């Protein structure tokens, strides 16, 4: 837990999922403070306040009295926002949580943006704003100074209007943007490409990992998926859904769930199945979730997973470990977790410790495919 002193307000903030107390990672950054300082002399009135990419709900908590809209592609960020509102005894009904594909309220007074890691996501969000902002809307974006690039500035200017940067403060920097009467060049809603060796056209929304091609780990994984399973298969951390789609093809008697914490990932998966395997839509479920929360114990025959090792800009194996533990809980006895991962992440030892077994299915210089089977022993 970390404390943020805003002068008139003190907040207790935690990262979510909660970390071990020994972690040095806190739930807020200097960019959050810097953004909030800019609002001291702004007359917000009754018009909407929009907040983008508020990773752990810091800005939403600080501005809860203005009934802000918090927009994020991350379900985990939404859970973090609810958690920190509750932690500070703030009414969660004061904050409206929206995903990045949702319609935005018109004519906002203020827009605060935490600049995301993916420039494509930022562009999608700025284009959505272009449709609703007023000429006098105050637009301020913030990030660590090292993450504010010339390309970032150019994107604001292309989509919204004139832009200037602030001085650096505590290694954070702001972008101030004015709304101009411009028409940005047209851009497709999704990035589309043909998957090698197939006739599938893959549609990726802006925040999907490796959005313009298939990453090399997934390419290896495609060649080593289980066959002829009857029952429930989960593509966990599904991204654009290519792994789950291959599982649909190779397991014609199975039901396949596409699960991710990214709204855009799940939307991309559904779009890709609908366009490429429409006859199999009745065998599919699409779910935005925190790993496998709420999935019934011992109800799944196989979990396929390409686990992330970043949470926002931080490197962590917390998400992968949660996925592995959830998979073990949900798997039937004899069911398997099959993953692809970078060699250096040592997933083999983690799976062996958790499941009591782990088999190397395939490998190359960078990636390994591992399988762990749930035994009948108590756990």
UniProtKB/Swiss-Prot annotation:
CDD domains linked: AdoMet_MTases
Keyword Transferase in the entry? The reply is yes
Q: What Enzyme Commission number does this protein have?
A: 2.1.1.174
Q: Which GO terms describe its cellular component?
A: cytoplasm
| Stored SUPFAM superfamilies | S-adenosyl-L-methionine-dependent methyltransferases
Which GO terms fall under molecular function for this chain's record?
A: 23S rRNA (guanine(1835)-N(2))-methyltransferase activity; nucleic acid binding
Q: Which UniProt keywords apply?
A: Cytoplasm, Methyltransferase, rRNA processing, S-adenosyl-L-methionine, Transferase
Would you say which domain of life the source belongs to?
Bacteria
The entry's localization annotation reads:
Cytoplasm
Keyword Methyltransferase in annotation = yes
Q: Which Pfam families match?
A: MTS (PF05175)
Annotated InterPro entries: DNA_methylase_N6_adenine_CS, rRNA_m2G-MeTrfase_RlmG, RsmC/RlmG, SAM-dependent_MTases_sf, Small_mtfrase_dom
Q: Which reaction does it catalyse?
A: guanosine(1835) in 23S rRNA + S-adenosyl-L-methionine = N(2)-methylguanosine(1835) in 23S rRNA + S-adenosyl-L-homocysteine + H(+)
The main enzyme category here is: transferase
Which HAMAP family does UniProt cross-reference here?
A: 23SrRNA_methyltr_G
User: Which family does the entry's similarity section mention?
Assistant: Belongs to the methyltransferase superfamily. RlmG family.
Chain's role: Specifically methylates the guanine in position 1835 (m2G1835) of 23S rRNA.
Q: Can you say what this protein is called?
A: Ribosomal RNA large subunit methyltransferase G
- Species name: Serratia proteamaculans (strain 568)
